[in-house]
Amino acid sequence: MATQPLSTSLVRFLTAAVSESIRRASEAGQLGSLTLEQAAGVAPTIQIPSDPRYGDYACPTPLGMAKLCRMAPAQIAQTLQKHLDLPGIATEVAGGGYLNFRLGDSFLAERLQELLRLGEDFGKTAAPHPERILLEYVSANPTGPLHVGHGRWAAVGSTLANLLRWTGHQVEREFYINDAGNQMRLLGQSLEVRVRQLQGEEVALPEDAYHGSYLVDIARRLLDQVKAGIRPLPTTPEEYTDFAYAEMLAWQKQTLQQLRTEFDHWFSERRLHAPDPQTGLSAIQQALQELQERGFLYRAKAPRGEDPKPGAEEAVYFKTQEFGDDKDRVVQKADGSFTYLAADIAYHRDKVRRGYQRLINILGSDHHGYIGRLHAAVGAFSPDVKLEILIGQFVKLFKTDPETGEKTEVRMSKRTGNFVSLNDLIDDPEIGVGVDAARWFLLSSSMDSPINFDLDLAVKQTFDNPVVYVHYSHARCCTLLRRLQEEEKVELTNKVTLTEQQKLPYQEPEERALLLRLLALPDELIAAAEERAPHKIIRYAEAIAADFNKFYDNCRILPLLKEDPLLAQARIQLVQATRQVLFNVLTGILGLSAPESM
């Protein structure tokens, strides 16, 4: 099988060069009191200076080495500079100990050539330590439509999966279906009442039932199928539950697909409660049995460190405190029934047994209390499997009130009866913004920040709307390239244009600034993946659009086709490169469309 061509991470490239210079200087005894062992432990840092006068990249590591070396930072930087092997890159010592790097034309040309050659694969890199990762997100109850918060987890989870894959990891995406417990019984009861109401009976919904109008639609579909002879009318609560469950799950899957969110696995909680054909034990019972054998369970009237309450009965506790939780947790009540935590334990045991090296769960802020107990569940079964829990804040929708002219929060939906659904956000005639805008704005902030979603801005067809601005930038590239091919008969080429002196023929600062921005794609993806920060790619896309439009406005192409064809060709290749990077970011990472005309 052919090896996948990979992109160059400029940060990793420079980091490796500085690390090698530290090793060489240390072996030559030129770094003062720094030992070879200490030299091997130095992890260089590469930054992009805020002022381009200080180079394209900078390394402040000599400043941090001063104490170990017992040398002045500037002296360390000068020593490392002598041992750097970076053809095509100029280095200088500045700022009392910084190593500054300026990429030369030959090096930039090689990287631009790589970008044009790799095309839709540009940005993909190998991970230094690739992992097999299970990423779980959304995981909603199949009792109602998905809400906007679920949409945020869907957008973040699917984008994070793309980021991890592009940066060299094997990722599987999973949706945990909460299809067991009392909520499912209530769903079936609610559907039965709606069916009886449609049949003319005067019967009220119980107070704790599901009141959304979506169940009326499901009841109508059920009666239509009964009338058509497709199925008989349910006669048991379980049959009503099963029909409602199938309808709701299908609806949720359709909504997620509409939002361009796919899953590799749909894991049913019911599997954890079903007895194993061989042992007769459910997955929950097997998990607790293993915890008992490992010494992590005990029976008591109160958790360790607390006095029993009057009349308390014995329950089975899990020693979650040993894994950092604030107190031990009940997994089996005195009556023999299992807690929700018991199912979570069995589920995470199943994840561990499937052989993943890292588990990532994306949860809403109302699940903050689960962090300690889930870490305990994974740690008890395997100290080697890493668990990350990403907690995200919720979303509020705002729209201008036509009567007052003020922004007001949109709380209610005609479709669901009590909240704005994800379907409403996508395609409701009054508040819908479409898939691209929904994904963009749901991805636009750090997960730990609440989102105030401006519905008016999301549908605005001006450059105030960042989705429109980035889409327009891609379409502008495509339109110009089409015109060059169709009207000007220019043949596009992926071979980088250089002068006779093997220099890039650029004349304006906007050209170089745009190229550096485009070449940063691999590092932008690596940083966003490592920091679990998809919103950083939103910022990167906005920066590309801004740099490209500055370039487009200041660096003309069409008049140069005859006046200076070499410069024109070099600028055309920057347009090609911009189109490619925007396409990769929009479609490959963010899950948006990339329009070719607007």
Curated annotation (Swiss-Prot):
Pfam (any one): Arg_tRNA_synt_N
Source superkingdom: Bacteria
Range of residues in the leader sequence: none
Classification via PROSITE patterns: AA_TRNA_LIGASE_I
GO cellular component assignments: cytoplasm
Catalysed conversion reaction: tRNA(Arg) + L-arginine + ATP = L-arginyl-tRNA(Arg) + AMP + diphosphate
UniProt-listed Enzyme Commission number(s): 6.1.1.19
An example molecular function term from Gene Ontology annotations: ATP binding
UniProt entry keywords in alphabetical sequence: Aminoacyl-tRNA synthetase, ATP-binding, Cytoplasm, Ligase, Nucleotide-binding, Protein biosynthesis
CDD domains: ArgRS_core (cd00671)
Classification via InterPro entries: aa-tRNA-synth_I_CS (IPR001412), Arg-tRNA-ligase (IPR001278), Arg-tRNA-synth_N (IPR005148), Arg-tRNA-synth_N_sf (IPR036695), ArgRS_core (IPR035684), DALR_anticod-bd (IPR008909), Rossmann-like_a/b/a_fold (IPR014729), tRNAsynth_Ia_anticodon-bd (IPR009080)
Keyword Ribosomal protein: no
GO BP terms: arginyl-tRNA aminoacylation
Subcellular localization, as worded in the UniProt entry: Cytoplasm
Residue interval(s) of motif 'HIGH' region: 140-150
Keyword flag Manganese: no
Family stated for the protein in its record: Belongs to the class-I aminoacyl-tRNA synthetase family.
Subunit record text: Monomer.
Name the UniProt record assigns to this protein: Arginine--tRNA ligase
Species assigned in the record: Synechococcus sp. (strain JA-3-3Ab) (Cyanobacteria bacterium Yellowstone A-Prime)
Lineage summary: Bacteria, Bacillati, Cyanobacteriota, Cyanophyceae, Synechococcales
